[in-house]
Amino acid sequence: TMDKDGKKVSGKIHSVETLGAADGPGLRFVLFLQGCTLRCKYCHNPDTWAACNAERTATAEDIANEIIRYKNYFGKKGGVTVSGGEPLLQLDFLTELFKILKQNGIHTAIDTSGAPYNEYDPRYKELLALTDLVILDIKHIDDLKCRELTGTGNIATKKFAKTLSDNGVAMWIRQVLVPGLTDDENDLKRTREWINTLKTVERVEVLPYHTLGKPKYEQLGLSYPLGDTPIPTREQIDKAKAILIG
């Protein structure tokens, strides 16, 4: 696609992981886009926040060519996952990339918070027709607690999930488990009830909070939002899994 000046749309790229096993089915080529409007307290990639700080910009065509070189490695079982940052902030680039990937028979996934979703933006229809899987990060089921945790409420995320469900788009739901913030039993039960209203959820994952991102905050001269918050115990993780998945 061309933008209004007739230039090819470029994506703001943070990094790539050529063979990742954690973001979708099989082996994945994971493309991390630059830029995010959320400020999740547990974010471990604060270096992806500022949209102007992209490591590089590249056209969808260039990135697709890079990906296609790895096609033999990820084969039929794997594919491509676009993560971030927040991929939905770069809709035109994402759609253009997925068009080329689908022409090449490659499985497409988006790892997103759903926060930028706007039901009145017609571009989503086109994107979702090219999307095989959405890995949806539900930050918090409670709108106010979500706002407190991320700076943004969860209404758009819930609307996005319903749109995916209504349009037959497969999704995985992810909940990051942070002691004292996202592990309240009643909240988790509400999350489970909400998941049960969605028709296309193939998998629910509980991601235990970790502190691997701490050094990045120091490098960026930022204070670490969660201070000394402990990582969850095995028991806390199992309890959350029992409610959300069991």
Task: Please report, for each region that a protein language model flagged, where it lies by residue.
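N-terminal/domain-start segments enriched in small and hydrophobic, helix-friendly residues
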Residues: I13, T37, T48-C52, L164-M171, ...
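Flexible, glycine- and charge-enriched loops at secondary-structure boundaries
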Residues: N53-A60, T150, N154, D184, ...
